[in-house]
Amino acid sequence: MSYDYRRLVAVVDERVPALMARQIEDAEHPDEGGFVGVDGLAGPNQVSSAATFGYVYLLPESRHHGVEALVERVERAAAWGRRRRTAAGRFDLLVTNFDSSPDTGFTVQALAPVVRAARKAAAAGDAGAARISEALGELIHTAAPGMVAGGFHTPNHRWVLVSALSMAMELFPDLTDRVAPTIEAYLAETIDVNADGEFIERSTSVYNPVVDRSLRLAAESLERWDLLDPVRANLEMSYHLMHGDATVVTSVSIRQDRGAHAVPTGLADSYYTLARRDGN
């Protein structure tokens, strides 16, 4: 099947009404502007959902392109994020991780590309894009020192933090002195990939995709193209672990996907990006 960018835009467009319904609009509610997750909680890390509103506002192919109401929704979400973040600028994952630098890293991964795109549109005269860039960019800038200080919980989190800090530094060069030493310290540990292309958690359907994406994003922000080598190795290995029905072997995992019947859709963006880059 050929790749058609417009099909993906249409899929995102279809998700917008449901996301609007999840955003709390009651001005008297303490979580006004926030998003209610599948767990029924308005977890602070859900501020990353604002990225969808930003994307469809910015994408010319979207039927929501240029709709100012979406800018207002982004700003309300960002205001909620400012109210709910911790003193260190970090966000909670309410079901398990509090004041969490890795979950903040996942949030920055989601928001940074929108800020980058919004800046380009703002430079071309789009006032709404400038508002999106300012609202979401502030969350990223404030979060960076907290990610530096906060540490991580699991192996893949190192690379989530490396990518998030790299993206923050690319957007805000004034952060370089604070975040670059942490990036280099994590990278000095070397990537946890073996000769077969397997990462240490062996999580073929959940965390290997997270590592691949994180290393790829870091490579792009840092222009450290050697970081793509373990991604290539893992994607090659993962291909050989796929069954005919597109599910992947999960019996090797040491994480919660062990034994799951899963299609590794999280690998799709890395396969596509490396295929285009390498002509493979």
Name what the model sees in each region.
Residues 24-35, 87-90, 195-197, 246-250:
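Glycine-centered small-residue hotspots that permit tight backbone geometry or close packing
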Residues 1-48, 68, 72-76, 80, ...:
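Low-complexity, Ser/Thr/Pro/Gly-enriched N-terminal "stalk/linker" regions
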Residues 6-9, 13, 17-21, 137, ...:
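Generic detector of well-ordered alpha-helical segments enriched in charged/polar residues
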Residues 3-5, 53-57, 91, 186, ...:
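Sequence-level detector for tyrosine residue identity
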Residues 225-280:
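Extended polysaccharide-engagement surfaces of secreted carbohydrate-active enzymes
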